[in-house]
Amino acid sequence: MLLKLLAGLTAAVVAAAPAAGASDRELAAGERVFRSQCMGCHSVEPERNRAGPTLHGLFGRISGTLEGFDYSEAMRTAAVEWTPETLDAFLERPEAVVPGTKMVFWGLRPNDRRGVIAYLEVAAQ
């Protein structure tokens, strides 16, 4: 019983920990970039779509599969699995990763991408 409790507590601590290697400063910077560049169209709250889909539970999801959001045909057929690496490429040049995406976005600089991804790894769980 005690082992199960300890295993559960360990899992909870690991899940709540910041993204590997992300400092508090990087997380705060990522949140600022998210709020200024992403939040107009995206939320990190469950079931809270805006002009873009919610990013809650993004990592591990396949592009274009969130129920209740009207994705472009390009996003549905791209079948990109969202990982920190694929999101980094997408946030650099969305059209290069998903040609025909209806997301109008010019891309982010490398430091901003790292910060946003670190923030989403924590906030969008």
Predicted feature locations:
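Electrostatic cytochrome c docking/interface patches
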Residues: 16-35, 44
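Generic alpha-helical structural context detector
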Residues: 11, 56-60, 89, 118
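C-terminal capping alpha-helices of c-type cytochrome domains
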Residues: 83-125
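Gly/Gly-Pro-rich "capping" loops immediately C-terminal to redox-active cysteine motifs
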Residues: 27, 31, 43-84, 102-107
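Sec-exported extracytoplasmic/periplasmic mature domains
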Residues: 35, 39, 46, 60, ...
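Hydrophobic packing within well-folded, soluble alpha/beta domains
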Residues: 38-41, 116
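Bacterial N-terminal signal peptides
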Residues: 4-16
